[in-house]
Amino acid sequence: MKRFILFILIFAMIPLCPAKAEPIKWVDFGVPYESLKYAMDVDIATNEEEKHISWIDILAVSACRTGGKCPLSSVKKAAQDLKGDKSPEEILGNLYKFYSYYQEAYDAVLGGLLGSYAIESAGEWKSTYGLKAYFPIAAGYGYSHCDDFGNSRSFGFARKHLGHDLMGSLGTPVVAVEGGVVEAIGWNRYGGWRIGIRSFDSRRYYYYAHLQKDAPFAPGLKTGDIVQAGDLIGFMGRTGYSDKENTNNIETVHLHFGMQLIFDESQKECNNEIWVDVYNIVRLLADHRSSVKKTRDGWQRIYPYRDLDTEEFTPTGNKNFQTGFDKAPFLCYTFMDK
């Protein structure tokens, strides 16, 4: 009898322990460039107002109404609705059941692109709120691109292209789009010389591939290092499609740039990885480019940068990295040529 009562008590307590929510398993990010730009501009314009309208919220409301298509007209209406006194739940009514998904998904894609940062120019630090992520190709270097996400690839096995290719010149400096930790650096039979950088919030994994033969990476860069948005990380090339290391086997010089979303660590390397189309994000970043220069001693970032939103991270042994300014990490470096 006592055992029966104990069983009943345990069974009754089960509902009090909520089950862990399943992580998002798929994101189809198809927000048009014009909609991204409009939502971002509203976010920036209202940053210091009494009611700050987040571009994530704008896009999530629009996505609920349009099944993720987010045409500009819908985004404008969503922004106008959110400027009022109603909450997203009141605005959306029955469609609110989709809101948490789109809010989480879009925050995972865009969460590290907008925020507070500071740039040093003429010996003075100037802080601002706005687009703090950078275009992956350094300022002053030409490029061309098109929306090629999902195109077929055949090396090794038939598959879809899960990134975005930017064509350019051999040796073009490649910079980090967003700050984070270098998780992978070295050779891959598909991507050639490549770098993988995990965002500080761990939700985005940025992949930069087909880097230059012989000198693919910023000198001294290694696994575990901290990089900030706009930092030099490598040089454009055409390596890859080979089991033999340091081989040029890609016909056209280009950068393969990709973004993987990770809602749970089990998604990092699996058969159902979540890679999103970054074409319109790259277009959004095109007017925000980092300037680097070649000096007698190596490569140098012209305008030092500080991310004012990120907690302090301690680099793993690279003395070129420094931290400070109210514990916000920043980088003012010279990479020495070897």
Model-derived features with residue positions:
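Surface-exposed, glycine-biased beta-strand/turn segments
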Residues: D85-W193, A229, V282-K338
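N-terminal Sec-pathway targeting helices
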Residues: M1-I8
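Zn2+-dependent peptidoglycan hydrolase active-site motif and core
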Residues: V177-G220, K244-T252
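Cationic-aromatic interfacial patches
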Residues: R3, P18-S100
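Conserved, short, structured surface segments that act as functional micro-motifs
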Residues: D225-D297
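Hydrophobic core
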Residues: L9-M13
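Structural recognition of the beta-strand scaffold that forms the well-ordered cores
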Residues: D165-M167, V174-A176, G196-R198, Y205-A209, ...
